[in-house]
């Protein structure tokens, strides 16, 4: 593995997560009492940027918050985690994005996202360098993601969540797409993508080149406390591992281990070790079909 981790620029959402933890998730029309309420920083983009920084990478966040107390709280959390927030816009007249989340005793969740400022920012004045790895998600406007793809001269990664139809131009630009198994099924065009990583929860993860499975790694055993943010930690770890020249099976195994630590943490932005510690911890993983 390369000893120097790459610079990762995340273009994505910044949310305040309002989380109600309860024994079970309500059914339609049902009210459940006895919940425990907490608020914490979140948003797929912010979660991925924080994970990249905590793993030892150089992380820059591009996104937006509202000119409100919640926005200031999100900026402080990002900066405190070591993320460069110079390109996070503070938008007058927009509320900071908010996610309303219910979590059950097994760590499963239901989420409603109110995008706020995430739906209103642009890349005006933002520049990307050739050595930057750019990581996007789909919780911000698709035009912003497309513009980032066009303007980024370096390695470009898309976490295609939430799932939606992807323009051919965007898919062709992606050096790597990361999805879970449900998203992989909902976006048929991914079978033609040059490189796709798919997570399967307890089934581990796999890598596909043009629809052909070329590598896989088993999941790490873990007791789930909260699945929010686990996929984001996986994304950050996989990007860093691949850009540090780890082969596909080992990069997947390292990302699985990071995701397992995240699942065991109650926070959407969990405490993580440095990437090299996960590399040392994880045994080799096999090539699919061998």
Give residue ranges: language-model regions:
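Glycine-rich phosphate/adenosyl-contacting loop at the front of the ribokinase-like
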Residues: 1-64, 71-72, 224, 289-290
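Conserved phosphate-binding/catalytic region of the ribokinase-like
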Residues: 2-8, 189-290
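Short alpha-helix plus adjacent loop in nuclease-associated cores
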Residues: 96-99
């Amino acid at each position: 593995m390369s000893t120097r981790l790459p610079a990762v620029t995340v273009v994505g959402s910044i949310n305040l997560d309002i989380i109600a933890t309860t024994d079970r998730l309500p059914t339609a029309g049902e009210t459940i009492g006895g919940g425990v309420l907490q608020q914490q920083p979140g948003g797929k983009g912010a979660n991925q940027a924080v994970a990249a920084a905590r793993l030892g990478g150089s992380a820059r966040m591009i996104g937006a918050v509202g000119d409100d107390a919640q926005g200031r709280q999100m900026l402080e959390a990002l900066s405190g985690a070591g993320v460069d927030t110079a390109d996070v816009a503070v938008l007058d007249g927009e509320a900071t994005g908010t996610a309303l989340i219910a979590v059950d005793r097994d760590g499963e969740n239901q989420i409603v996202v109110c995008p706020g400022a995430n739906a209103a920012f642009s890349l005006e004045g933002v520049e990307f360098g050739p050595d930057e790895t750019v990581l996007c998600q789909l919780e911000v406007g698709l035009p912003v993601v497309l513009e980032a793809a066009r303007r980024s001269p370096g390695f470009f990664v898309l976490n295609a969540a939430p799932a939606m139809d992807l323009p051919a131009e965007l898919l062709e630009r992606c050096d790597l797409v990361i999805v879970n198994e449900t998203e992989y099924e909902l976006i048929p065009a991914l079978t033609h993508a040059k490189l796709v990583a798919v997570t399967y929860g307890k089934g581990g993860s796999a890598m596909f080149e043009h629809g052909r499975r070329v590598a896989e790694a088993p999941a790490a055993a873990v007791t789930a406390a909260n699945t929010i943010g686990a996929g984001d930690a996986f994304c950050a770890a996989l990007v860093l591992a691949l850009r540090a020249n780890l082969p596909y099976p080992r990069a997947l195994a390292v990302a699985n281990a990071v995701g397992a630590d995240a699942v065991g943490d109650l926070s959407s932005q969990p405490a993580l070790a440095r990437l090299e510690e996960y590399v040392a911890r994880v045994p080799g993983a096999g090539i699919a079909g061998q």
